[in-house]
């Protein structure tokens, strides 16, 4: 028998395929299912979802900021500060409050604290009553509660009401850092100077550890403002706290501020937390002004 090359086209759904003599035929494909072209594998079983697929929101939905995975806490590390053992940089982003932008009503500040990869480490929320916020303005005393990814308060910042005039070297600004809440791990105290913003970082025993020095003029357009963190003898720069330029619109019409903190990777985690507290004190002292004043 001569062999002929016959190219068969896919049958229509519902028809039977003819086989060798004596066979009753093969059932055709079900209606509604396409027959794969020659050379392609047939589809697998239907009805089972594909596992381990990333879930994405619909277009226009707000993106969820990922949290930094919690590392194993080292010995003698206050609970919640183990995140700081693996980083040498923090990014602080203040959230925009619509009510404050529209009518100028001062609300409690909220911040996202992230690492250099954009992963959220902490969430900070101010806890101050309405009367104090709107009567004292940026000079107000406040309690800042810093939460981890489990919603636990791991750091508490306490700023008392102090004098804001540089002409009087008494009752200068100060902030206390507690980790965990109720256990002081350090302080940031203002050092009097007629022209420069200066601060001292202290440990829980109020012993001086580092110094902070800012520029003479706390004003800049389209550029960052750096506060250098130095050794006690002012010879070495070990880090800095930078107020980032957020853009002309935000700078003019809101008091939303973004900061960056850089410190040595091997710095004591307690001092890293104290530098975080210094950042909030600097924000309220120099950049938390109501727009239009």
From Swiss-Prot:
One of its GO terms (molecular function) is metal ion binding. InterPro entries: Scramblase. One of its GO terms (biological process) is plasma membrane phospholipid scrambling. GO terms for cellular component: plasma membrane. It is found in: Membrane. It is a single-pass type II membrane protein. Residues 1-270 are cytoplasmic. Keywords: Calcium, Lipoprotein, Membrane, Metal-binding, Palmitate, Phosphoprotein, Transmembrane, Transmembrane helix. The chain crosses the membrane at residues 271-287. Residues 1-39 are annotated as: Disordered. Its cofactor is Ca(2+). Residues 288-293 are extracellular. It catalyses: a 1,2-diacyl-sn-glycero-3-phosphocholine(in) = a 1,2-diacyl-sn-glycero-3-phosphocholine(out). Residues 1-66 are annotated as: Proline-rich domain (PRD). A lipid is attached at residues 166-167, 170-171 (S-palmitoyl cysteine). The modification Phosphothreonine is found at residue 143. Belongs to the phospholipid scramblase family. May catalyze calcium-induced ATP-independent rapid bidirectional and non-specific movement of phospholipids (lipid scrambling or lipid flip-flop) between the inner and outer leaflet of the plasma membrane. The N-terminal proline-rich domain (PRD) is required for phospholipid scramblase activity. This is Phospholipid scramblase 2. It comes from Bos taurus. The lineage of its organism: Eukaryota, Metazoa, Chordata, Craniata, Vertebrata.
